[in-house]
């Protein structure tokens, strides 16, 4: 997986999360909503931090995607999901502002936090599921 400085990984956060959730013993309708919000969040980062020459239109597209991410996850009416998503935005933007690269490693603890809210099996097990899903295996 090639990563471009200042961008999210080419790997889809939405698909990775859905693969991780697929390994859970029980289905949870919240997982689809969280995955959808992750897709919007990644679109926002990609638009805002596409690299050199980000235009005003890119910023507007990114802002709209962030708004859709927040609106989507807020449908769950569970502050824990919103808190983790907020940390994802803060940590990713902070890393980029410091000149770093946003990689899957950056997102893994946050994705695990979201998964743990759904699975209640602990952050360590949730992180293992995320890593397995990123490698193309179900958790």
Where do the language-model regions lie?
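All-alpha prenyltransferase/terpene-synthase fold signal
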Residues: 1-139
